[in-house]
A protein has these predicted regions:
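Glycine-/small-residue-enriched transmembrane alpha-helix faces in small-molecule transporters
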Residues: 1-44, 78-81, 89, 150-177, ...
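C-terminal-most transmembrane helix of multi-pass membrane proteins
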Residues: 2, 47, 146, 214, ...
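Transmembrane alpha-helical segments that form core, pore/gating elements
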Residues: 25, 31-33, 54, 113-119, ...
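Hydrophobic/aromatic residues within transmembrane alpha-helices
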Residues: 35, 42, 46, 77, ...
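Specific alpha-helical transmembrane segments that line the substrate/conduction pathway
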Residues: 41-52, 91-124, 164, 242-261
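Hydrophobic transmembrane alpha-helices of multi-pass small-molecule transport proteins
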Residues: 54, 58, 77, 83, ...
């Protein structure tokens, strides 16, 4: 009986980490809207405020921050640049579109990586890859069309979030080999070190207010997104296959839609729900069928 209890606990803890990590990340757009700095400035503080803890966790885990090859260093710098642009684009989109759309399109990197794999491997989609692509295209068309019906600003917000998904896919591809040489916390810390100046420079160029009057949303954003969300998912990824990770990802649009409805009166009509389900299904399928590719 005790052995069975231990086995249930061994499964429950990683599952709780998977769900908790996705919920923490899904609350990010809400906190960006609550911030009284600019959206790109909020991205800078999200990275900068989390840096000390990321470095501390890397050292506590025995990871070495300063020992890497030139190729790894260049990959980290390039990845950090793309990550900074990803955060900036996503945060700009969050302010204009609905939270459910922002979360879905912001996570579109999985689908983009799947399509990129076809280009690299020089082959057409097969099997379950076709339904993933068709669902992504159909769902995106529905959501983009609905945003255009609401306002042009909503459509622009969607496009910024889609651009963020594209940039995040590039970030993952560039850091593909660096992940072997660096631990998870070290990679997050070094990528953050490279992306923070990018975000600060963009915020200043856009004329955004950088210094907030209320630090609470930014402190919670940095802790929930960079520490709790990323940390829990790093832990959970070791315990589940891609299908379960993909299904866990569906927590994010559900939380985004709920917060959008309760806090910002964002109502999803039945057609919106069809679009959300199609894109969410595509995200799950993309995580299952995407082969590992080398850039």
């Amino acid at each position: 009986m005790e052995h069975q209890s231990d086995r249930i606990r061994d499964r429950a803890v990683p599952f709780a980490a998977l769900v908790g990590g996705n919920i923490a990340l899904a609350l990010g757009p809400w906190l960006v809207r609550l911030s009284d700095s600019g959206p790109v400035s909020a991205g800078f503080w999200r990275i900068a405020l989390a840096m000390p803890l990321l470095v501390l966790f890397a050292r506590m885990s025995g990871e070495k921050l300063g020992h890497m090859s030139r190729a790894t260093l260049l990959a980290v710098l390039g990845g950090g640049l793309l990550f900074g642009l990803d955060v900036a684009s996503w945060h700009l989109g969050i302010g204009d579109t609905r939270l459910a759309n922002a979360v879905l399109f912001g996570n579109s990197g999985s689908i983009i990586l799947m399509v990129w794999s076809f280009v690299v491997l020089r082959r057409l989609p097969m099997g379950r890859e076709w339904p993933a692509i068709m669902a992504a295209l159909a769902g995106s068309a529905i959501l983009l069309g609905r945003s255009l019906e609401i306002s042009h600003a909503n459509l622009v917000g969607d496009l910024f979030c889609l651009l963020a998904g594209l940039l995040y896919a590039g970030y993952l591809l560039i850091l593909q080999d660096a992940r072997k040489a660096l631990g998870s916390w070290s990679l997050l810390a070094l990528a953050g070190l490279a992306s923070a100046p990018v975000l600060l420079g963009l915020a200043l160029a856009l004329g955004e207010p950088v210094w907030p009057t209320d630090w609470t949303p930014l402190l919670v954003l940095a802790f929930s997104s960079q520490i709790v969300g990323q940390g829990l998912l790093v832990y959970a990824l070791r315990h589940f296959p891609p299908l379960v990770i993909g299904i866990g990802l569906l927590t994010q649009p559900a939380v985004g839609a709920l917060v959008g409805w309760l806090v910002f009166d964002e109502v999803l009509l039945p057609l919106d729900m069809v679009g959300v389900v199609l894109v969410a299904s595509a995200l799950v399928l993309a995580r299952v069928v995407t082969p590992r590719v080398r850039s």
